Amino acid sequence: MTKRKHSSKLVDGPLQAASRSMLRGVGFSSEDFKKPLVGVASTWSKVTPCNMHINDLAEIVEQSIDESNCKAVLFNTITVSDGISMGTEGMKYSLVSREVIADSIETVVGCLGYDGLVAIGGCDKNMPGALIGMARLNRPSLFIYGGSIKPSHENTDYVTVCEKTGEYAKGDISEDELIRIEEISVKGPGSCGGMYTANTMASAIEALGMSLPGSSSQDAISNNKKHDCKEAGTAIEHLIELDLKPSDIMTKEAFENAITAVIALGGSTNAVLHLLAMADAIGVDLHLDDFSRIGENVPVVADIKPFGNHFMSELNEQGGISPVLKMLLDKNLLHGDCLTVTGKTLAENLENISPYNSSQGIIKSLEDPIKGSSHLRILYGNLAPEGAVAKITGQEGTTFEGKARVFNSEEDGNQAILNKEIKAGDVVVIRYEGPKGGPGMREMLKPTSAIMGQGLGDKVAFITDGRFSGGTHGFVVGHISPEAEVGGPIALIEDDDLIRIDAESNELILLVDEEILQERKRNLKNINMSPKKGVLAKYKHLVGSASKGAVTDSYDQ
């Protein structure tokens, strides 16, 4: 198998002189045309701290590839910032950006005949977007995570600011104190520092086998992260030499490894959505029920924010996630024979990993975990016939029954919470925020943080057909499918209806007689204003159910 399977069609022979001429214009030499071409997809942007340093890393990757027997070509794709747009109309574009990233990477690499691909990402949607693009292309590929931000000197971060906003609304802190926390909490480059969505997905990708061992926990600004980038050239050259493609690595068993890691680390509900979409892109049959099946046997062992006490940078100082993976492998909770981007199996990568220092308090033992089974619960019932995803650690209890307070947008719900209209025992329902309904399936960090900040985290439940930030904690259920926009049962809820959430029986039940629900369904009117043009209109037309990953290129859904 030639190492230049794709680029040879672009640059070889007299008839490709014009193509070569263009490439000479960007600095190619005659020798470069004899090498495999490797695209380096950078998500650099100054719109967010998560990505402001990515081009520095991309240039190290570019140099490392050029120093191997390959030729790097650096290009950019987009990023948006969930943290900046949270709670606004702009958040409707967040999940959409996952598809734009995947589409743009696929477009550039497919158009320009690259033999391999290295993608570097920071903010939440960069990771699944890059992996979806890699899966579609199915050429030797490697992902590099941009790394975590360090917490402030007071151990605060972005999520702290969100929750302090709730405390301010309640009257517990002054505006001056809120601004003080705002000013100190996000300093410099890197992704949000807890086990929020970015770190969850970076960890999942390492467990999946698509990034180099140890890379998911590194600080954004560190020698370790630079070293990770310097290793990329040798790694991608080896992958091209072996013709080791994403389809060889991203198997059903590898996805089960990723799910196991996400659960053990107490990861974000967004991992469910993104892993389903990544599996769909590579042709792996992954379902919500796989998360339930695996979750019954995998405990939560990481005491990491949002519901724990530590940050990813602290875990990195103890050895990152590799010792966690080794713990899981030793208990036969991982498939050790899965291939990885090193060309070795997961078990071979972990063979010489030492256990954590016994004095560290971040990772608990499998025998004495934080929670004995998964915090990610897949719920079904008359409110979620196609499923819903709950994030329940047990700190807030495992069952909740209360009266519905119904809102048809995030803004309406958030305002009611800030106005102190939500009381203990309520079930906040925010609907018409699903993939089609938003459109865009916004994250509900602002309202859930306001609930936590007002001291109602264990007294109020929150359900939505939208989704949650990785920073969300409390009694929350999202991804309710079918969504309100397509007439799902969540559209039928009225104020004061009783709702029962049971994370033990995995049920989400609307306690209203079926005859009444059928009458409501007959009288249901679509209240949503649909976009007529632009990316949101295209997305609404194409996107499928959250229960299948909210993908945009499966036309038989």
Name what the model sees in each region.
Residues 94-103:
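Glycine-rich, highly charged phosphate/nucleotide-binding loops
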Residues 1-52, 57-78, 83-84, 89-94, ...:
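Catalytic or ion-coupling anion/metal-binding cores of large enzyme and transporter domains
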Residues 109-130, 142-145:
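A short, small-residue-rich loop immediately preceding and capping a beta-strand
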